[in-house]
Amino acid sequence: MPTEGSTVDTLTIEEAAAELARLAKEIAHHDALYHGKDQPEISDADYDALKRRNDALEVRFPELIREDSPSRHVGAAPSVTFSPVVHARPMLSLDNTFSQEDVQDFVAGVYRFLGRLPDQSIAFTAEPKIDGLSMSIRYENGRLVTAATRGDGTTGENVTANIRTIAEIPNELPKGVPAVVEIRGEVYMAKSDFLALNRQMEAEGKQTYVNPRNTAAGSLRQLDAKVTASRKLKFFAYAWGEMSEMPADTQFGMVQTFKDWGFPVNPLMKRLNSVADILAHYDEIGLERPDLDYDIDGVVYKVDSLELQARLGFRSRSPRWATAHKFPAEQAFTIVENIDIQVGRTGALTPVARLTPITVGGVVVTNATLHNADYIQGIGNSGERIRDDEHDIRIGDTVIVQRAGDVIPQVLDVVMEKRPAEARPYEFPKTCPVCGSHAVRERHEKTGKLDSVTRCTGGFICRAQATEHLKHFVSRNAFDIEGLGSKQIDFFFENEDASLQIRTAPDIFTLEKRQQQSLTKLENIDGFGKVSVGKLYGAIDERRSIALHRFIYALGIRHVGETTAKLLARSYGTYEAFETAMREAEALSGDAWNDLNAIEGIGEVVARAIVEFYKEPRNVEVITRLLEEVTPEEAEQPKTAGSPVAGKTVVFTGSLEKLTRDEAKARAESLGAKVAGSVSKKTDIVVAGPGAGSKLDKARELGVQTMDEDQWLALISG
């Protein structure tokens, strides 16, 4: 993680510009994982450190503030799975505070901005910050008409059908409410319901969920509303968007009105009149936190008077009248009993610390990721020191373990005073512990730097990679085959009977046929039965036709997650077109290669990984056999009858003045256009704003149609 504060002043303008560029990309990556995929890979504390570093650099170098700066944007672009909803009023994020001094500064800033003296009391509300999914629910004439996620703050995802299944959210409001009401709040899953769901998943041999927040978000994004209904989601109302008339003149009064209208509101919300009272309530909520049946990660403070809120106004992405006081990351001390190596489906060797059990934040922690060989030595991904030189992690060490934001626990540091005399430096394996193949750290072709990850070179001869690949193939967001969980995959993979073996994905779809010709019947084996085997065969047959993006994601191509798979499916339309293009791009040059790199959201690293995947004969052979059993469907395109840009490839460049870049992209895609990140022969339109540079030049050189923002808006408004 970056260091903060004093080092900012020592940077040159070139160093600051380079770091701001890196931070913009890194924070956008984490925003997409958290808001778009509900799969955070760093803790809230580490994310906040990145944001603070970015803010500190922008204060010191205001001339370097970027168009894509995290300080200008909220969240991440909405998913392409659900139709976009443009919020009538933006759903902004809150600034964070981390200490009593920060809170005192926030309150003092409110008084200063309003020209109030300390003896002229200003009331604040204080309420728990729910760790769930932000939601905006619109009612017209008392009836629920639309529900949308936060998305990027301007445009969210339409999840109306799923929201209607949440019992705590009324479909109709009492008589006499304003004609237009937008209720905003948090959808969450109770801890007790989360534990019950995981027990059910375990009993069914399925993969369990990571935490309530991600589970709630994933449940809300189900295409089948019946699945959402089965998840027992809950809701707290705490804010509003568009209102045709205001039923109260204070924050507290508005929330109490929501309660009167039938919405659940948090019972721990209070109205307070001093910093001392605010901080005391923060401590009270912190003490209650372990006993609450829902996750919280801080306390939100808001100026109570709506008149004063209006006077205070907003910064670019947050209100001046509110802040979120975050809880510190939860830490504990324990002992490293052993270090094991896990091998993933891409061959990554990940060290895991086996710990003396310790309770952190109400959860018993027995394992913690050590990430890679460098992390064990105290070196971060960027090559910087993250611990003192001698603070490498050894078996027998007493370590500080942190669990923040429900991310996998991590070892922060070593307590050197308690290091046993016999503790020896950990030697990272040079061979795969599963198959014995050589384990290497790849060197980046352009930078010459070693990858932080050590990988097994065994490929599919490595049992760990093969089984993990199969588990990925049948996972929830890939083929999602009910009855084929982790335990079942291990059983079929290790079986010596040819009629029961599943070693590659095509074997799944030939299982029933092989069983019909065998004397060894699956239904006679412990753990199975006639009914469950019948259901398994039925579940397999249901997946003989599958959405294109799920098929691509299931292949397990390195760097290709769900979002990237959807981009590829939308861009190529059919699997045949996709595979043909990847083969044509084999030389990493030419039109097919350029077209792949031009897809918005696909960079050279991802593009290279996809092409390399198709250059491997073993992969092509497995896919060929798979296509004999499975039919990938054509990608569903937006309904764009009469759209002047349907099917066209559009590139936006320069500064847009009437739309944000995300808005422009969402509008174009909703009309059936494909948005690319670079100009090629296949580009149809380049929309150029002030500051357009090389992309505009290339468009003119290739004879591509160019227009300004006003011409674009006129074209799509028709």
Swiss-Prot record:
Keyword DNA damage: yes
Names of the cofactor(s): Mg(2+); Mn(2+)
Single GO biological process annotation from the record: DNA replication
Coiled coil: none
GO cellular component terms given for this protein: cytosol
Keywords carried by this UniProt record: DNA damage, DNA repair, DNA replication, Ligase, Magnesium, Manganese, Metal-binding, NAD, Zinc
KW DNA repair (keyword) present: yes
Domain BRCT positions: 640-718
Membrane-crossing residue ranges in chain numbering: none
Reactions accelerated catalytically: NAD(+) + (deoxyribonucleotide)n-3'-hydroxyl + 5'-phospho-(deoxyribonucleotide)m = (deoxyribonucleotide)n+m + AMP + beta-nicotinamide D-nucleotide
The enzyme's E.C. designation: 6.5.1.2
Organism superkingdom: Bacteria
Record-stated family: Belongs to the NAD-dependent DNA ligase family. LigA subfamily.
Task performed by this protein: DNA ligase that catalyzes the formation of phosphodiester linkages between 5'-phosphoryl and 3'-hydroxyl groups in double-stranded DNA using NAD as a coenzyme and as the energy source for the reaction. It is essential for DNA replication and repair of damaged DNA.
Full protein name: DNA ligase
Lineage: Bacteria, Pseudomonadati, Pseudomonadota, Alphaproteobacteria, Hyphomicrobiales
